[in-house]
Amino acid sequence: VRILIGNHIDPSIRERGDMRAWTQRLLWFARPRDLLILCCEPDAAFVDYALAHTGVKRGELTVLAAPAGAWGDRLLDPASLSVPTFVDRVRAALGPAEVGAVTEVFALWPSAAVARFADALGLADRFPGAAFFGQSGGEIGNSKANFRALAAAAGVPILPGRVCHGRAEAIEATSALLEHSVSGAVVVKQAHNGAGVGNQLLVRDAQMAVDHVGARHLHHLAPGPDGIAAYWAERWPWASGEGRWPVVVEDFAPCADAVYSEHYASDADTRATETGRLLYVGRRLSHQVVPLDGVTEPVRAALLDGGARLAEAYRALGYRGHLSADALVLPDGRVVFTEVNAQVSGSLHIYQSIAHGIVNVAAEPARQVVEYHVPPTWAVPSFAAFLAALDELGLAYDPATRTGVIVSMPAIPLAPREPVQFVFCLAYDPAEGHAGTFDRLDARFANVPAGTYDASQHIGTGAVSFSS
């Protein structure tokens, strides 16, 4: 028996919008007898769809919606977990025998509120890292500023850069980096954000190729010191979260490939769990592929070695659970690390539940899995319409061939008459690739007229529903 909690980053660290759909990826981790806690009642069609793939029966799960807090049913309010009546409800749903049988409390985000919830149930020892997370260790482990210090201590290669605590320091760091930068560009990073949403690329050359970069925002610097000073006068509040967090200023590495190695940190040790590749289009995360291919053995070894050293450094702090070490493969073959996501990343369900659990990518013939974000050019009217199109095109996942599309999360419109926004996985033969299948779906759904969406947006116009 496990308790699975579909939360997201604490709003006290970073405000989020409507996370109902993204947090329902929790269903992919569910096993018989598990109790799931979500911010709302799950989408019934998606529950049936996901469980049909995992083989878990709906009646084998208990699903509870946490009390609506400050964000209604759009986001799980951390404070809701500790409401005494809800704790009693969880205890009653488990039953006296099952409370003692709980083997793990598992949360998408390692919140101090989860530690308090586990303690209220008498299950603090079943939430790995509870003591660390109870003292806001989740914020410590997920800061890009803290990452640079920990990576330096672990001897893991990172790009030239600096952690800045004020505007004057940021101006000085930007000037120094640009003076010695081969690319003539730097990346500004918020301490707390994900999927490139909190990154801004500062360039002097307006013709520089940046489409592939994980940086939602782009700024062309005016010439000279005045251009740098003007930028920070305008953007320091955004970059620092109104002065709450330090800011990372880092050299930009052009023509680099984005990869990652994921690890699990336990009380005893750490172990590698998967490697993969991230691909950006229009500076937004477009898709990711597992397992990682197309790299040399020295690159793979460097990725795993650096990831393992980072995982051990975070474990030594007190972190427990899954974590992802993001890196860049530079054109000369060097691997440099850029951040650690010390949480259940947006990759875990792809490789653990879908690629290995359903597709079995390690079996013969070989398979890979790519997960796509719905592009901003697509207009998908509903979950049912997408599934119907998959059936019509013969693209739904086929267990016999171990190829086809599996929708990874419910498709919930964020506003009336808006297209639904979601992610979907595609299992494919590496010899054939995934572009052909994607192109067939693109031909069906790419109906959004040019000029009506912002290409730098994560998934189109309007509120962003998900990102790691």
Language-model regions, residue ranges each:
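Glycine-rich phosphate/pyrophosphate-binding beta-alpha loops
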Residues: 280-284, 340-352
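Phosphate-binding site of ATP-dependent enzymes
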Residues: 181-187, 192, 203-204, 213-279, ...
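A short alpha/beta connector and helix-capping loop motif
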Residues: 336, 348-361
